[in-house]
Amino acid sequence: MFMSALQLVIVTGMSGAGKTVAVQSFEDLGYFCVDNMPPKLLPKFYELVKESGKITKIALVVDLRSRAFYDEIVEMVRELDENEFNSSRILFLDASDEELVARYKETRRSHPLAMEGRILDGIHLERELLAPIKSNAQIIIDTSKLSPRQLREEIFKNFEARDTKTFHIEVMSFGFKYGLPIDADIVMDVRFLPNPYYVSELRNKTGKDDAVYEYVMKSEKTEEFYQKFVSLLKYVIPGYIAEGKSNVTIAIGCTGGQHRSVALAERIGNELSKEYPVHMSHRDMNKRKETVNRS
């Protein structure tokens, strides 16, 4: 039935135990997430994924919102356990009866299996029905005393929490005269560094040109700043990863975004790319040239 080494996580467990938070966490880890797919559709879905060749990690949420799917879920878990899909894992989210009742009362929602609106009866029935699936789970997380943030941390810890390939860095340059980038996490002002704009032969070049780059970098002030700032970034980035961030945008700004910020962004991006996936962009590098051309 399953014939590939795609990474598949079956996310299941008690209703109200945190599957919504789990799905959001898997999305941040780079998983393609599908919520409540009827198990009979999984083989066809799997074939489509395999043909596309673009999806390598899948998180599939299955639960008992419809009791009609129960036998199919158990059979699917049995097949995953017995044969070809060797890279599959089952994550079972659990919580105490008392905590689940409290959560349902807080949200004023009814349990999907509750008869005549009695929440505890629905919980007991669901726990009984899910027992065979829970016994097959490789990872069980009790969310009774976990906040959404703590549950997210547990999922990251168990599923590639320290895989820096899922963490991306955007290093961008910009000009303060055109406004701050609204999506930046870290903004650094480098207008205190020597400005190539005042060197006539460099004015119309950019920080990507060797002459401008060398002019900016030869300053002792630039070198001291660079070493200290990169040291700071290398200190805080592992903390961002541990916190569960999937990306961070570092914005380097000078007056017009043409010289100093471009040169520094290039050097910083190249250094960080030795350890992390990095994308570099220069928001305002060509704006002065475009303005001149329009005039």
UniProtKB/Swiss-Prot annotation:
Tell me which residues bind ATP.
G13, M14, S15, G16, A17, G18, K19, T20
Q: Which UniProt keywords apply?
A: ATP-binding, GTP-binding, Nucleotide-binding
Q: Which GO terms describe its molecular function?
A: ATP binding; GTP binding
Can you tell me which residues bind GTP?
D63, L64, R65, S66
Which one Pfam family would you cite for this protein? Answer: RapZ-like_N
Q: What does this protein do?
A: Displays ATPase and GTPase activities.
Q: Which family does it belong to?
A: Belongs to the RapZ-like family.
PANTHER family this protein is in? RNASE ADAPTER PROTEIN RAPZ
Provide the protein name: Nucleotide-binding protein LSL_1171
Q: Which organism is it from?
A: Ligilactobacillus salivarius (strain UCC118) (Lactobacillus salivarius)
